[in-house]
Amino acid sequence: PKGPYVCYDHFLREGSDEEILGLNNIIFKVIDKLNLLPSDGKGGYRIISNAGADGVQDVPHFHVHILGGRSLGRMVEKIN
């Protein structure tokens, strides 16, 4: 989103319904264009948004990363 949002929860709290729906629609279009939709029989994807110190957020504005095109494996070790 183009607004002054710092992270996902800030975006959900302060963003308009139109902005929130718009971002989700754009994410879907990108995933579809990248040919990653599991509902179309493709391999899938992962959406990441880092937030705060524990989330290792280095850039102080809200954005998402879309990963796909290969097996991504686990990013965080499984806790017993």
Language-model features: where?
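HIT superfamily nucleotide-processing domains
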Residues: 1-80
